[in-house]
């Protein structure tokens, strides 16, 4: 994979903002981008599953798990679901699990960290809402660009 975010910053510096979160890469695809779809949830990944069941062609799911690493909001089964439905990547402001398997899967995955515990399944959460993570705003329908160097957000799709 090539580094995409430095090139984007060089070419579109005034059109992007840095999503300054301490994220780590867990998927095989370490550079990915797409239109943002959002989920806000806490210790319940029901809405994550609902969204990943939809067509994700050209899209990246950003999950606001309130920064909690006490339950994993994404595991190998949901990552497989994302791959089957064409998602470019998933960014979790929280924890993931099954990371050995996920590292072999052709999908971008970034998260704060790992946790072996699964979440509850109560159908709780919000989809396509504005997220605020560490005082940074993420809007649905904006665009995200992620790699080892960081995560960038733009209002429009960038031709790079």
Swiss-Prot record:
Cysteines paired by S-S bonds: none
What EC designation does it have? 4.1.3.17, 4.1.1.112
Q: What does this protein do?
A: Catalyzes the aldol cleavage of 4-hydroxy-4-methyl-2-oxoglutarate (HMG) into 2 molecules of pyruvate. Also contains a secondary oxaloacetate (OAA) decarboxylase activity due to the common pyruvate enolate transition state formed following C-C bond cleavage in the retro-aldol and decarboxylation reactions.
Instruction: Write down the superkingdom of origin.
Output: Bacteria
User: Subunit structure, briefly?
Assistant: Homotrimer.
What sections of the protein cross the membrane?
A: none
In terms of NCBIfam families, this protein maps to: NOT-MenG, PRK09372.1, PRK12487.1
List residues binding substrate.
75-78, 97
Give the matching InterPro entries: RraA, RraA/RraA-like, RraA/RraA-like_sf
Protein keywords = Lyase, Metal-binding
Give the protein's recorded name: Putative 4-hydroxy-4-methyl-2-oxoglutarate aldolase
Q: What GO MF annotations does this protein's record show? A: 4-hydroxy-4-methyl-2-oxoglutarate aldolase activity; metal ion binding; oxaloacetate decarboxylase activity; ribonuclease inhibitor activity
Would I find Nucleotide-binding among this entry's keywords?
no
Signal peptide range in chain numbering: none
So where does a divalent metal cation get bound? 98
């Amino acid at each position: 994979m090539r580094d995409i975010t430095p090139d984007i910053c060089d070419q579109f510096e005034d059109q992007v903002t840095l999503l300054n979160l301490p994220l780590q890469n867990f998927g095989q695809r370490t550079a990915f981008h797409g239109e943002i779809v959002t989920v806000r949830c806490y210790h319940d990944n029901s809405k994550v599953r609902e969204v990943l069941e939809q067509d994700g062609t050209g899209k990246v799911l950003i999950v606001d798990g309130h920064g909690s690493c006490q339950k994993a909001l994404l595991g190998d089964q949901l990552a497989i679901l994302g791959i089957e439905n064409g998602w470019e990547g998933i960014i979790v402001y929280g924890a993931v699990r099954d990371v050995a398997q996920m590292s072999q899967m052709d999908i971008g995955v970034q998260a704060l960290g790992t946790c072996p515990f699964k979440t509850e399944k109560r159908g709780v959460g919000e989809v396509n809402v504005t997220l605020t993570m560490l005082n940074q705003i993420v809007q649905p329908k904006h665009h995200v660009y992620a790699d080892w160097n960081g995560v960038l957000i733009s209002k429009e799709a960038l031709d790079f």
